């Protein structure tokens, strides 16, 4: 996960010509779109999320002077994750140069993907079959306690479907 700080030049929205602006929100918006495009176009099935965006001074009549945002990149393969991080850094550098907005990118933390143990997963599949339950393999890019446990001991997880596939939502429901 990364914190990104985009600095522009706050200025009057009505009197500052477009070609003279250093709009931090425009630069941040380009980062948001670049993050989405990276994940969609990258081979495999990585995910990328901009989950927080803070605009300053956050006023309708002022060209935004700074924006703070977070970027969360995830994949089950650490090589793919490293490629995404390198691509993010390139995109941020390019966008900063094109918009004239200085951009600082700071790593907040890095979590290596942890694979479930084959033996544990086989036991889960066997138990589901014995009970006549359907099952499928679902790689998880979420950070669970199991991720840390799996670094020391054999680990596996059981997921049950929520209605509509929703998670981390007030509408999440599982029965």
Predicted regions and their residues:
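Acidic-glycine-rich active-site phosphate/pyrophosphate-binding loop
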Residues: 1-8, 126, 156-159
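Midchain, well-structured core segments that form catalytic/ion-binding scaffolds
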Residues: 1-79
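His/Asp/Glu-rich mid-to-C-terminal helical/loop segments that flank catalytic regions of hydrolases
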Residues: 19-42, 85, 90, 160-175
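Flexible, glycine/charged-enriched surface loops at secondary-structure junctions
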Residues: 37-50, 95-106, 132-139
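A short beta-alpha structural unit
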Residues: 49-58, 69-77, 102-121, 141, ...
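Solvent-exposed, non-transmembrane alpha-helical starts
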Residues: 80-84
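Short, low-order "capping/linker" segments at domain edges
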Residues: 113-131, 156
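Zn-dependent metallopeptidase/amidohydrolase metal-coordination segment
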Residues: 135-175
């Amino acid at each position: 996960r990364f914190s990104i700080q985009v600095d522009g030049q706050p200025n009057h929205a009505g009197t500052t010509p477009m070609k003279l602006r250093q709009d931090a929100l425009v630069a941040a918006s380009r980062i948001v779109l670049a993050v989405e495009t990276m994940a969609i176009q990258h081979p495999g099935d990585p995910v990328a999320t901009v989950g927080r965006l803070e605009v300053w001074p956050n006023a309708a009549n002022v060209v935004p002077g700074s924006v703070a945002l977070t970027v969360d990149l995830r994949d089950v393969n650490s090589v793919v994750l490293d490629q995404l991080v390198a691509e993010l850094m390139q995109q941020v550098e390019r966008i900063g140069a094109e918009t004239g907005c200085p951009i600082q990118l700071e790593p907040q933390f890095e979590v290596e993907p942890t694979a479930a143990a084959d033996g544990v997963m086989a036991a889960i599949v066997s138990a589901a079959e014995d009970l006549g339950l359907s099952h499928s393999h679902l790689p998880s890019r979420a950070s669970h306690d199991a991720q840390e446990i799996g670094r020391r001991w054999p680990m596996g997880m059981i997921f049950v479907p929520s209605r509509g596939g929703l998670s981390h939502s007030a509408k999440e429901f599982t029965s």
